[in-house]
Regions:
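Internal gly/pro-rich beta-alpha loop/helix module
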Residues: 140, 153
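Short helix-terminating capping/connector loops at secondary-structure junctions
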Residues: 125, 158-163
Length: 178
């Protein structure tokens, strides 16, 4: 296996069930996944903390503090049938769109797959749509984004349906010059 048992136990939200079972065995992986996804999350398994929540009638903005004291935001949009969560994939953003606050301080780092998944876990809400469009440019963190989607879709964990996951990316346009 390419991971150690300590890596799996220290950051379990960063691994699919298959990866876990290859490293720590099927029985322990099954028990750990049950603890992670079928019960309320326990602080010992989380690498980020909720620092602030701003609520309005139909939206909630969460500010999370990461282990390296950096901050990211996640937005939950309430709907009659559950909710949509807008998830960050980076700390800061390298694109610098003029309409976006995230890029004003520049790019700091990519989020790990675990940090992406934990944004959804920490909401403790019924989420039926995930949009990767919070802080950062999702496709600039492609490997961790794809791994997070695999973890979210894992049938032993959240078993999130594919049709409820969307990414939003910028399009680079070259405008004609005069």
């Amino acid at each position: 296996p390419k991971y150690t048992p300590a890596e799996v136990r220290n950051d379990p939200y960063g691994f699919t069930y298959k990866e876990m079972s290859e490293v720590i065995g099927e029985n322990e992986a099954k028990a750990l996944y049950e603890e992670l996804y079928k019960q309320l999350p326990r602080k010992k398994n989380l690498s980020m903390l909720v620092k602030n929540i701003c609520k309005s009638s139909d939206t909630e903005k969460y500010v999370y503090e990461l282990k390296d004291n950096k901050y990211i935001e996640t937005v939950f949009i309430k709907r009659r049938d559950g909710g949509t969560v807008c998830v960050s994939t980076q700390v800061g953003c390298p694109v610098g769109c003029i309409f976006c606050e995230s890029g004003r301080n520049g790019f700091v780092r990519n989020l790990t797959s675990s940090e992406i998944v934990q944004q959804i876990i920490l909401l403790r809400r019924k989420v039926n749509r995930i949009v990767f469009m919070g802080m950062g440019e999702p496709l600039f963190n492609y490997d961790n984004l794809i791994k997070a989607i695999h973890i979210l879709r894992d049938r032993y964990g959240l078993n999130f349906p594919t049709d409820g996951i969307t990414t939003v990316s910028y399009t680079h346009l070259t405008l004609p010059t005069k």
